[in-house]
């Protein structure tokens, strides 16, 4: 059948995940905070002392297609100039809140001129303020399929371009069509702060653009105790993840402080201890709002893991400070239970409030994971046979 599959028929091979964040606080009075959206509540049923405030990071997972990685050495030519863009659009809110799991969706309806052969390819270029993986450790895009038959394999090139290379399905076929729906996630490295951004996708010089404002959450500040965090990387193939926590980003002096990080959903009780690194932030005013931190930058981060009172057990860590008087970043690398329904990591800072004398309080920040799915489908028709040649009519004899 040459019918175009619906998106519900598309395989779940290109799944996208977002990491959600919620805050919990002991306060003198109840704070007004936003309610989580439906997608976030799918990931975490958190009983917070006050209404939850949520953020989300994003993850894309696809089944590995080993042929894709080795596919760039085959023959074929760029057929981007054979593409007609029937429709293109970047669907998005005008304001994107990445920490709430919000993303854009690039949609293309394409047709291809005749003469496309196996091995030929076309490229989609994206502006560097977005990526297709979210917090996934592996970059993948979906195959274009007609039913279960692969029309083209997708791969991510080193420069970030998306390349689709056609299979033998297209040989001797015409009327080739493709429909793509790809999630685009704000890149926390290239967009470190709240800002106006133009998201642009390009095929053969033809641009599709959406202008948005990127707005990050600033974590939780409860009577001077402040925490922020994000799940920054997740690998579903080996069930590992990386979490970053900002401790005391507002840079107050907090006596008798304790930091506690814990996997509260999805902990894998396998006896393996997580890897925990603690960094003192040397330039607190330059911390990224996006909760992206290159901890290898020694001009910004000083590794103090061996200089503090750190205790690490299965699925959690605890840091005790007599006086917390600097900003810290905690990097937490761990396995998780791949069979769990959700993954949630909680960071809590407790101590004496710098606002109120002898007032003990705490602030918690939860990060979870949500999944999105990319879709791609297509079709092509067998060429119609040339009509049987009609014989020339018998010549009529000349009149006598």
Each language-model region and where it sits:
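Intrinsic-disorder/low-complexity, polar/charged segments enriched in Ser/Thr/Lys/Arg/Asp/Glu/Gln
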Residues: 103-107, 121, 161, 179, ...
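Serine/threonine-rich, low-complexity linker/repeat segments that form flexible spacers/stalks
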Residues: 29, 36, 40-42, 47-116, ...
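Acidic, proline-/serine-/threonine-rich low-complexity intrinsically disordered repeat tracts
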Residues: 7-9, 13-44, 48, 53, ...
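Low-complexity, intrinsically disordered segments enriched in Ser/Thr together with acidic residues
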Residues: 164-206, 313-353
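A surface/secretory-pathway sequence property marking extracellular, secreted
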Residues: 54-57, 61-88, 129-166, 262-316
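Short, hydrophobic/aromatic beta-strand segments
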Residues: 117-124, 133-137, 254-260
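Hydrophilic extracytoplasmic domains
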Residues: 288-397
């Amino acid at each position: 059948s040459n019918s175009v599959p619906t998106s519900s028929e598309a395989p779940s091979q290109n799944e996208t995940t977002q990491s959600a964040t919620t805050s919990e606080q002991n306060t003198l009075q109840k704070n007004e905070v936003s309610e989580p959206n439906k997608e976030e509540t799918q990931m975490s049923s958190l009983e917070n002392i006050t209404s939850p405030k949520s953020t989300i990071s994003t993850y894309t997972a696809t089944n590995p297609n080993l042929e894709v990685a080795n596919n760039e050495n085959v023959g074929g030519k760029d057929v981007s100039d054979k593409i007609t863009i029937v429709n293109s659009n970047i669907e998005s809110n005008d304001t994107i809140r990445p920490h709430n799991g919000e993303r854009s969706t690039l949609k293309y309806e394409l047709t291809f001129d005749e003469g496309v052969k196996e091995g030929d390819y076309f490229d989609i270029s994206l502006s560097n303020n977005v990526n297709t993986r979210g917090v996934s450790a592996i970059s993948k895009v979906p195959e274009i399929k007609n039913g279960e038959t692969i029309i083209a394999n997708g791969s991510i090139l080193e420069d970030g371009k998306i390349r689709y290379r056609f299979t033998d399905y297209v040989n001797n076929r015409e009327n080739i069509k493709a429909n793509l729906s790809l999630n685009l996630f704000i890149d926390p490295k290239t967009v470190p702060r709240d800002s106006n951004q133009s998201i642009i996708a390009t095929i053969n010089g033809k641009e599709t653009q959406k202008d948005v404002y990127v707005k990050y959450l600033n974590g939780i500040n409860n009577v001077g105790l402040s925490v922020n965090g994000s799940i920054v990387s997740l690998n579903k193939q080996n069930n590992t993840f990386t979490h970053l926590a900002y401790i005391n980003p507002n840079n107050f002096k907090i006596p008798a402080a304790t930091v506690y990080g814990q996997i509260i959903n999805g902990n894998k009780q396998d006896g393996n201890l997580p890897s925990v690194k603690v960094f003192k932030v040397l330039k607190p005013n330059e911390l990224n709002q996006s909760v992206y931190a290159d901890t290898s930058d020694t001009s910004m981060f000083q590794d103090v893991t061996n200089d503090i009172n750190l205790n690490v057990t299965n699925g959690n860590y605890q840091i005790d400070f007599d006086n917390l008087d600097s900003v810290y970043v905690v990097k937490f690398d761990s396995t998780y239970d791949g069979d769990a329904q959700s993954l949630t990591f909680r960071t809590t800072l407790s101590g004496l409030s710098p606002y109120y004398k002898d007032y003990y309080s705490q602030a918690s920040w939860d990060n979870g994971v949500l999944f999105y799915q990319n879709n791609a489908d297509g079709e092509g028709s067998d060429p119609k046979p040339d009509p049987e040649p009609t014989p020339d009519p018998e010549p009529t004899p000349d009149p006598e």
